[in-house]
């Protein structure tokens, strides 16, 4: 197997300086948003004055908040690491669909095997946590009650995993994880982007696949469930708004789980290396920043957000419509890709929605051997799945109202991520497909919203 250590100037995310800024800045931002939620009624905390003394007091106050409310206790380590270990055991032992990844050029076109059983892991975890809750062994409200300490543990664990994976790859290569791949030569940038493409322990425990669904989306869902249970214990009922975030996070976790085999041939799996960017975001960023809608509802009396029936119903309709487009659009794209590569697998996992699979799809057969889908949802907009995904995220914030900016962090951040991702996708598609991509844009002229943009 040939080595692919190629030293080149870092380009994405501002190179090493940008990577370092993200690696230090985002954990700080997470703590700041959490402190605003817990200690300042979900409003931004500001310095008393824009002087040296004012900023000193500002940072001293934040440090105190973190110490008293987010200290990484031994129990928090036990809870978080136990959750990860149990998920790893399920990953290796529960039944699922076996499939293969895309041919990897740096591994002589080898196609790695994958066992896709996240859907079994999801519902098994629900049953286990339900039993532990009713037997008082482990209250599911722990996920929301210990939000701060668990967030700290997730952040620490993400940094540790990044360091171990980066150094292990450089020192031991595929004897431990995987061979170094597309290195820039700058250790900060390479740790951020990743030193290897497909790190594994053994033949089936693929770290990238493991962190893709089970850690971020499962924990996010259980944070919301914990909030719902705590609200029921406090008020004797669960508000429609808290039920909404539970539904939204359930739909997303379930969608990622039931379509796990469709993740295998995606760009993330076949090209994106596994470093701090993916490790931190999946382990800490997703569950502990996308949940600010839940934190707001949890920390306020339901009377504060007792919206009109019309408003609440409208947000429910928005969520369900966007979810339908999101689910079926991604299903169409990935089923088509699997058909092309001969890895098509039909599963009956819930929910099976109409128009999930396109019969007799139309597509462009490109000069480089690739294909570009021109039917289904993509006939109307080339990135319509991003549009649906964004409006789902926006609905999670809209259900909280407009009294706090914190729930809107996720949709605002996600919008920036999507714009960056789309610009990167277009640039790479133009380079990869050339004139065929121009023809694709002619047939499918709209990017996000049909007949508008």
Curated annotation (Swiss-Prot):
Its EC number is 1.3.1.71. The chain crosses the membrane at residues 13-33, 77-97, 118-138, 153-173, 209-229, 278-298, 311-331, 399-419. It catalyses: ergosterol + NADP(+) = ergosta-5,7,22,24(28)-tetraen-3beta-ol + NADPH + H(+). NADP(+) binds at residues 333, 337, 373, 385-386, 425, 429-433, 440. GO terms for molecular function: Delta24(24-1) sterol reductase activity. The gene is sts1. Keywords: Endoplasmic reticulum, Lipid biosynthesis, Lipid metabolism, Membrane, NADP, Oxidoreductase, Steroid biosynthesis, Steroid metabolism, Sterol biosynthesis, Sterol metabolism, Transmembrane, Transmembrane helix. It is found in: Endoplasmic reticulum membrane. Belongs to the ERG4/ERG24 family. The keyword Membrane applies. In Aspergillus, the biosynthesis pathway of the sterol precursors leading to the prevalent sterol ergosterol differs from yeast. The ringsystem of lanosterol in S.cerevisiae is firstly demethylised in three enzymatic steps leading to the intermediate zymosterol and secondly a methyl group is added to zymosterol by the sterol 24-C-methyltransferase to form fecosterol. In Aspergillus, lanosterol is firstly transmethylated by the sterol 24-C-methyltransferase leading to the intermediate eburicol and secondly demethylated in three steps to form fecosterol. Disulfide bonds: none annotated. It comes from Schizosaccharomyces pombe (strain 972 / ATCC 24843). The lineage of its organism: Eukaryota, Fungi, Dikarya, Ascomycota, Taphrinomycotina. Disruption phenotype: Abolishes the production of ergosterol and accumulates ergosta-5,7,22,24(28)-tetraenol. Leads to susceptibility to cycloheximide and to staurosporine, but does not affect tolerance to nystatin and to amphotericin B. Leads to cold-sensitivity, a supersensitivity to divalent cations and several unrelated drugs including staurosporine, caffeine, chloramphenicol, sorbitol, and SDS. Does not lead to a sensitivity to nystatin, amphotericin B, thiabendazole or hydroxyurea. Erg4 catalyzes the last step of ergosterol biosynthesis by converting ergosta-5,7,22,24(28)-tetraen-3beta-ol into ergosterol. The third module or late pathway involves the ergosterol synthesis itself through consecutive reactions that mainly occur in the endoplasmic reticulum (ER) membrane. Firstly, the squalene synthase erg9 catalyzes the condensation of 2 farnesyl pyrophosphate moieties to form squalene, which is the precursor of all steroids. The keyword Oxidoreductase applies. Signal peptide: none annotated. It is an enzyme of class 1 (oxidoreductase). This is Delta(24(24(1)))-sterol reductase. Pathway: Steroid metabolism; ergosterol biosynthesis. It is a multi-pass membrane protein. GO terms for biological process: ergosterol biosynthetic process. One of its GO terms (cellular component) is endoplasmic reticulum membrane.
